[in-house]
Regions:
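Alpha/beta-hydrolase superfamily serine-hydrolase fold, recognizing
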Residues: 7-12, 16-188
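An N-terminal hydrophobic leader/cap segment in hydrolases
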Residues: 1-7
Length: 188
């Protein structure tokens, strides 16, 4: 649309506003898709909105997806991207939607536990924080969700977990410790 410039290299897309670029930070956008689907057109609309509202560049890792890959591979792919963004831009906030929100939360917990430089904030939109799909309330919500179905999500969660237990906090951050995490906003 002419408002942005973008580069793509080694599975990392970087999108910049053509005008009004603010200094002092960047966003990393982790897309949703149940850890099995790539970005879709609507998610590019989210990226546009983030740039329009913040004036910051957005870095979009095309992280490895299940069932061909596992969460561990995605962690190994995204963590260096965070490090590089911090070195280049200083302040880094991760915006994750759905599965990307669960991934963002897991990455922040891992950085905390490894005493690595933490991101400056998390914005989580409807984060998928429990891939076990065992919460009894799911049956109440299921009829209202016309797209996502419990059996398919449970399969995706198991595929994403790989050799890890789906209830492991790195896979389902709901079971992790939130103490010491960066400031976060959660939208449902």
């Amino acid at each position: 649309r002419g408002r942005f410039t973008a580069t793509c290299d080694n599975g990392i897309t970087r999108v910049f506003p053509k005008r009004g670029l603010r200094s002092g930070g960047a966003l990393i956008y982790l897309h949703g898709g149940a850890y099995v689907y790539p970005m879709v057109a609507g998610q590019w609309g989210i990226v546009e909105g983030l740039i329009d509202r913040t004036g910051l560049p957005v870095i979009i890792p095309d992280y490895p997806l299940a069932p061909e890959h596992t969460a561990t591979e995605a962690f190994d792919f995204v963590q260096p991207i965070i490090d590089e963004a911090q070195a280049e831009f200083g302040r880094v906030v991760i915006f994750g939607d759905s599965a990307g929100g669960g991934l963002a939360l897991s990455l922040a917990m891992q950085r905390r536990d490894a005493d690595e430089r933490q991101v400056d904030g998390l914005v989580l939109y409807a984060p998928w924080v429990d891939v076990t799909m065992t919460n009894p309330c799911i049956e109440e919500v299921q009829p209202r969700d016309k797209v996502l179905r419990v059996p398919g999500l449970a399969w995706a969660g198991r595929a994403w977990a790989g050799d890890l237990d789906p209830a492991d906090w790195r896979i389902s951050p709901l079971y992790g410790d939130p103490v010491g995490l960066p400031p976060m906003r959660i939208f449902q």
